[in-house]
C-alpha cells in the first residue's frame, strides 16, 4: 500500500478547489508530480505544493493500493476524493464541501465533520464520518434528477437539512439527528436516522426511511401496520400519496 501524506502549509481564509486529491489522480505520479498538480485558491490557480506539504512513498502504485492521508484543517478544501473509484482517502480532521462528490468506489474516511453536499451524486463506495455532516448529504446538485445512486454513507453524529434529497439508490445512516426534509423526492434510496427529524419523505416515490427518534409525519402519508424492528415497535406509513408514491416510512413508537 502506497501512502501519500498531505498537510496544509498555512491556514486558508478562502476555499480551495482540490478535486485532484484522489487516488486516480495521484497513484501513478511521483511526489514532485503530485506537488505540481493544479488547484484553485479562490479565483487564482496554484500548485498543490504551493499550499500543501506532500510527503510519503515515492514508488507509484495502483489506485486500489493507494492511501492518501490528509492531516490538518481541510475544512476549506472542497471536492476531496471527487470521482474516486478505488483506494482510500483518510481525512484526519474536518473536510470541506463536496467531499466524495461522484464517488464510484473506494473508501473516504473523515475523523472530524464534513461540510455541505457530502457524497453528492455518489455511485458506489463508502463514506464514513466520525463527526457531523452539513446539508444535502447524498443529494443531487441543482437541476439534477438523481442524487446518490449507490454506495454507503455512515455518519456517527448529526446531519443537516435535505439529507438524501433526490437519491435514487444507496444507503445513508445517521446515528444522530437530521435536519428538515430528509429523503425529499427519494426515488429508491434507504435512509436511517437514529435521532429526531422533521417531515421526512416529502414527495418520495420509492425507497425507505426509518426514524428512531421523534418526527412529524406529512398528512399525505397513509398509516399502515405496526412492525417490529430489532425488538422495537415502528409505525409504518406509505407514501408520499401526493406523488402516488410507493415509499415506506417507519417511525419508532414512543
Annotate each predicted stretch with a short phrase.
Residues 1-73, 78-79, 83, 128-130, ...:
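Intrinsically disordered, low-complexity terminal regions
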Residues 48-49, 65-104, 109-115, 119:
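Surface-facing alpha-helical segments and adjacent helix-coil boundary elements at the starts of domains
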Residues 91, 95, 103, 110, ...:
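Fold-core signature of tandem repeat domains
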Residues 96, 115, 135-139, 179:
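Leucine-rich repeat
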Residues 100, 119, 137-138, 164, ...:
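Short glycine/serine- and acidic-residue-enriched loop/turn motifs that recur at repeat junctions
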Amino acid at each position: 500500500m502506497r501512502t501519500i501524506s498531505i498537510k496544509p502549509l498555512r491556514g486558508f481564509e478562502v476555499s480551495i478547489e482540490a478535486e485532484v486529491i484522489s487516488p486516480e489522480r495521484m497513484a501513478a505520479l511521483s511526489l514532485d508530480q503530485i506537488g505540481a498538480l493544479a488547484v484553485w485558491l479562490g479565483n487564482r490557480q496554484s500548485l498543490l505544493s504551493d499550499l500543501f506539504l506532500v510527503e510519503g512513498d515515492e514508488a507509484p502504485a495502483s489506485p486500489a493500493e493507494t492511501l492518501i492521508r490528509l492531516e490538518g484543517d481541510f475544512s476549506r478544501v472542497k471536492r476531496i476524493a471527487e470521482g474516486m473509484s478505488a483506494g482510500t482517502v483518510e481525512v484526519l480532521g474536518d473536510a470541506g464541501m463536496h467531499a466524495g462528490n461522484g464517488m464510484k468506489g473506494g473508501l473516504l474516511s473523515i475523523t472530524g465533520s464534513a461540510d455541505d453536499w457530502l457524497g453528492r451524486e455518489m455511485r458506489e463506495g463508502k463514506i464514513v464520518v466520525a463527526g457531523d455532516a452539513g446539508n444535502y448529504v447524498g443529494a443531487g446538485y441543482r437541476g439534477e434528477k438523481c442524487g446518490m445512486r449507490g454506495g454507503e454513507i455512515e455518519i456517527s453524529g448529526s446531519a443537516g437539512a435535505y439529507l438524501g434529497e433526490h437519491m435514487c439508490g444507496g444507503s445513508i445512516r445517521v446515528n444522530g439527528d437530521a435536519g428538515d426534509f430528509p429523503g425529499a423526492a427519494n426515488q429508491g434510496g434507504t435512509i436511517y436516522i437514529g435521532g429526531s427529524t422533521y417531515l421526512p419523505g416529502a414527495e418520495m416515490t420509492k425507497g425507505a426511511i426509518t426514524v428512531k427518534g421523534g418526527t412529524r409525519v406529512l398528512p399525505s402519508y397513509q398509516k399502515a401496520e405496526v412492525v417490529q424492528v430489532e425488538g422495537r415497535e415502528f409505525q409504518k406509513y406509505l407514501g408520499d400519496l401526493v406523488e402516488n408514491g410507493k415509499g415506506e416510512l417507519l417511525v419508532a413508537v414512543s
